[in-house]
Amino acid sequence: MWSVTGALTVAVPPTAAACRTKPFLISSSFPKQTKKLHLSSPSLSLPSSHFSSSFKTAATSIEQQSSVNKGESTKYHFLVANAKFMLDEEEHFQEQLFERLRYFGERELVQDFWLVIEPKFLDNFPKITQRLRRPAVALVSTNGTWITFMKLRLDRVLYDSFEATSLDEALASNPTTLEFDKPKNWVAPYPKYEPGWWDTFLPKVTQESAV
């Protein structure tokens, strides 16, 4: 140590107390660490089965909630035109529907679109029925974006939407038999679609009631 007095600098030897080894400021109660510390506890690492079961539990609760809320209304979008145009003349309409049905099947999706012959919900749209030749056919879906796309493809159709509390209510129809005359001269290089191709897209409740 150095002591400064006036202008003189005198060397003072360190005392014995200053030379003592000072203890570390760490409690002796801590255990001696012989291994590297881990920032995360091994008990926090959960197996993948835990997340799988959690997901199943969440999915189950969602299903239960949806079953409780069956009384809530759902919005349905639809395109409608006369049956002759929609089912017999507009051939690429059939191709669009079967392509979408194949897409849903490959990805195991629940079908959300249907064809409804003479739908009962048209009674609530007098402005549409005034412009519509009968019998009429509607393409109904809960997917508004896809219905907008189909409207651009079909062009000569009318669009609107409505709400219903059940699928049976939304897809209810009046019994109608469709018969189209076969063309006298078919010039296309492929055979014409057979009548009844649309049965695949009719609501299941309608098919069962017709039996």
Curated annotation (Swiss-Prot):
This is Protein YCF54, chloroplastic. Transmembrane segments: none annotated. Keywords: Chloroplast, Plastid, Transit peptide. Belongs to the ycf54 family. Residues 1-80 form a transit peptide. One of its GO terms (biological process) is chlorophyll biosynthetic process. InterPro entries: Ycf54, Ycf54-like_sf. Its main location: plastid. It comes from Arabidopsis thaliana. GO terms for cellular component: chloroplast; plastid; thylakoid. The gene is YCF54. Involved in the biosynthesis of chlorophyll; acts probably as a scaffolding factor in the MgProto monomethylester (MgProtoME) cyclase complex to stabilize CRD1/CHL27, the catalytic subunit which catalyzes the formation of a fifth isocyclic ring to tetrapyrroles to form protochlorophyllide. Pfam families: Ycf54.
